[in-house]
Amino acid sequence: MSAIVTELLSTGLVEETRAGISSGGRRPIILEFQDQASFIVGIELGATHVSCVLTDLRCKVRASWSAPAPVRDDPDVALEKMTMAVRSVLDADGVDLSRVLGIGVAVPSPVDDERPGELLPLVAPKWEGYNIATHLRDDFGRPVFLDNDANLGALAELWWGAGCSSGDLAFIKVATGIGAGFTINRRIFRGSRGIAGEIGHTSIDPNGPLCVCGLHGCLTTFIGTPALLERAEAQLRDSGSNRPPPQNIDDLVNAALEGDPSSVEMIRYAGKKLGIGIANMLNLLNPRTVVLGGG
């Protein structure tokens, strides 16, 4: 035990603060965890934005940064934004790069252990040949960890959220696309080549729209953000409404909250389609807990 404490003291992760109350013999020395001994950078790479946070070792956010970016269409701009984001959060809190333990990146794509740092070409074809982990390591010289955003959402819920008491959890992320992260016995289930959890590419209508993956009627083709906005615009046009079409999901939700019948119907439509996908997943995996999230 003393060897472990000595090592923790040498790294600065714990600190001797005061003498405790003795129950017999020498008074003990109280040790306290130093949550600002080091820091962690987290990056979320969305389909249309880059967000970044700096946290201490208790995961308390100390600085944040976010900006729109054409992530799917322009990898060079997205990588530039990521570099800018990391520098911005470090500068905002006055943290030297040497105190950063590592950089974690959440990406809207499966991550293959055989191609770490890369996005799946089928999901993000314009990222072919780009390696996010290599780019960030070259820029900052710190360890970089990359994983699917829904997988990381599942881990967050498992450790700090709705799944704390459950080892079997499904985290469903509804955003530009639809993804899922599964934990089984408190471990992420990745499947072969990290593609487990692509619930957005499960077909709920074999006669439905053609998806980029080659299937027809994938969940994403019905309730992914582009599909919902396109459907909402068509409904407004057909109804003769003077309301401008929604430019994003916030516009659609706000219109529904204001009582716009067409927008309310769109939300119900999305809920029904999502319910079909979740029901299929429940019958297949039977997780104890299901968490819905977005991005």
What would you call each of these model-derived segments?
Residues 47, 152, 176:
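Short, glycine/acidic-enriched loop or turn micro-motifs at the edges of active sites
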Residues 130, 176, 253, 257:
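Flexible loop/hinge segments that line or gate small-molecule binding clefts
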Residues 20, 108-111, 176-177:
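Short glycine-rich anion-binding loops that position phosphate/pyrophosphate groups of nucleotides
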Residues 107, 148, 174, 225, ...:
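Short secondary-structure boundary segments
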Residues 160-223:
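Glycine-rich phosphate-binding loop of actin/hexokinase-like ATP-binding domains
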Residues 14-17, 144-148, 182:
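General beta-strand structural signal in soluble alpha/beta enzymes
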Residues 2-99, 140, 166, 206-207, ...:
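ATP-binding/phosphotransfer module of carbohydrate and carboxylate kinases, centering on a glycine-rich
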Residues 61-168:
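Glycine-rich phosphate-binding loop and adjoining helix at the ATP-binding site
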